[in-house]
Amino acid sequence: MFLNSLKLKDFRNYKSLQVDFSNSINVLIGDNAQGKTNLLEAIYILSMARSHRDNNDRDLINWSSDFSDITGEVQSKMGKFPLEVRITRTGKKVFVNHLTENRLSDYIGNLHTVLFAPEDLDLVKGSPGVRRKFIDSEFGQMSANYLFNLLQYRSVLKNRNAYLKNIKWIGNNPKIDEDYLKVLNDQLIDFGSEIIFQRFVLVKELEKYSYQIHKAISRNEKLTIKYASFSGIDDQSTKEEISKIFNNQLLKNKTRELFLKSTSVGPHHDDLKFSINGKEVGSFASQGQQRTTALSVRLAEIEMMKYETGEYPILLLDDVLSELDGDRQTQLLNFIQDKVQTFLTTTSLSDVERDLIKDPKIYQVKGGTLVNG
């Protein structure tokens, strides 16, 4: 899979841009705050219909305009076709082959991307929310069914939390519509159990690829990745067993949730556990081991996406070479060479990096403009 070209209109600091890309490695060189990361962000939005770093779409629009437009030509096993994301002050629309897609689940999956940025260290040492965002973002690109269940679950969760928040109390007694709460619980269990079951399957697959890559670049250290959900659930559990335990947990925590006014159990509270030789990475590993783990997982993601979709994704490397030592730089660049279209940002390329990258297409980025370097 390749992104042949990109057009930006009033996106961040880009008033207008039209650029063609190499199917190999594209290097974006420039000082800080010139637009390198903005360009990677535009490609990510074209893939996922949302930013990886900003929750407010209005901030993506150039200050002098009322809308922003991102258009790209994708080349995949399905042929060539345009994707477009149009962002206004009041919302956004997405288009595939010039036709509006009303459902996000139908749009995502047309352009597969893997993003690797310095903050990916948070993947192993950050909060569980960072890791949930990672698996939802990547698994959602690989599986339309996973994405559908995830979006439905989030919708039901939002409705359930709103209901819990608005329950009126008379003294110590809440006035509950038990029938309505049961409908919400049943929907939450249905979609949530599917998510948990699929996460176990996909995390097991991710662990398989990560283990082999990590072993090769870490002198035979053994990396394990485990999905942590409800007590009593593991990767051998059936959907029926997961549903039963989920239901029991909701019943057990009912009083607590009425006081909290939010849903305290479910896959939106689950986590990933990374271990090297049996020791938890976030707590006991060195910074070098944490970086090797993050790198291994991202490279595994590329291979897993190839296996699941039949095509390599596009790789977005946002200023990560400066965060990696020479050995890890070599491992990364050798891995992607000649098989993955890559977009790499940096303030400068060292002589070593230039030797490692074969025939890169270099762009100089300055003030929202690109010039072939």
From Swiss-Prot:
**Which family is this protein grouped under?**
Belongs to the RecF family.
Keywords for this protein: ATP-binding, Cytoplasm, DNA damage, DNA repair, DNA replication, DNA-binding, Nucleotide-binding, SOS response
* Name the record gives this protein: DNA replication and repair protein RecF
What is the phylogenetic placement of the source species in the record?
A: Bacteria, Bacillati, Bacillota, Bacilli, Lactobacillales
One Pfam annotation reads SMC_N
Entry's Gene Ontology molecular function annotations: ATP binding; single-stranded DNA binding
The protein's matches in InterPro entries, at most eight in alphabetical order, are given as:
DNA-binding_RecF (IPR001238), DNA-binding_RecF_CS (IPR018078), P-loop_NTPase (IPR027417), RecF/RecN/SMC_N (IPR003395), RecF_2 (IPR042174)
Q: Hey, what's the signal peptide range on this chain?
A: none
State what this protein does: The RecF protein is involved in DNA metabolism; it is required for DNA replication and normal SOS inducibility. RecF binds preferentially to single-stranded, linear DNA. It also seems to bind ATP.
> Which residues are recorded as binding ATP?
30-37
Annotated GO CC locations: cytoplasm
- Places the protein is found: Cytoplasm
For this protein, the record's PROSITE patterns field holds: RECF_1, RECF_2
Q: Which GO terms describe its biological process?
A: DNA replication; DNA synthesis involved in DNA repair; double-strand break repair; SOS response
Q: Which organism is it from?
A: Oenococcus oeni (strain ATCC BAA-331 / PSU-1)
